[in-house]
Amino acid sequence: KQGGKVLCGGERPKELSDGCYFLPTVIECPDRNVDTAKIELFGPVLSVVKFKTEEEAIQIANDNDYGLSSGVFSEDVERCDRVSRSLEAGICFKNCYRFISYAASFGGRKQSGYGRESGYDAISAMQIKKTIWTSNSRVTEDPFKIR
């Protein structure tokens, strides 16, 4: 309806017709405004949007309301580093996808969530921290003196 072209998949597997299952699907999008390129799909769907420059690719990736995860694939390690730092996503995979560790924090940005699950960051977010300073000196010192 919006001009996207299904390159493969896009249908239910016959043997799984009783559920909400779809074959892995690749959609070629004429621009970044196709819904499948702008919403968070929790299914095997890849929306492909063509770009000419690195800057345009970053702009396309960041031009949506979501930012759970992203992936950058390139033989140029410096480009991978540069682009991954520019993407507005809670997780960025470089030359891999879905490497997950329970020790690492997990979470998105924008409408994909606030805060982190797993790892130290998740524990830290649940704590109420307080700083307490104690002086063992019997002499009352100037409270406005920086030590």
Walk through the language-model features, giving the residues of each.
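Short intrinsically disordered, low-complexity coil segments enriched in acidic
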Residues: 1-4, 134
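Conserved C-terminal structural/oligomerization subdomain of aldehyde/semialdehyde dehydrogenase
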Residues: 12-14, 21-147
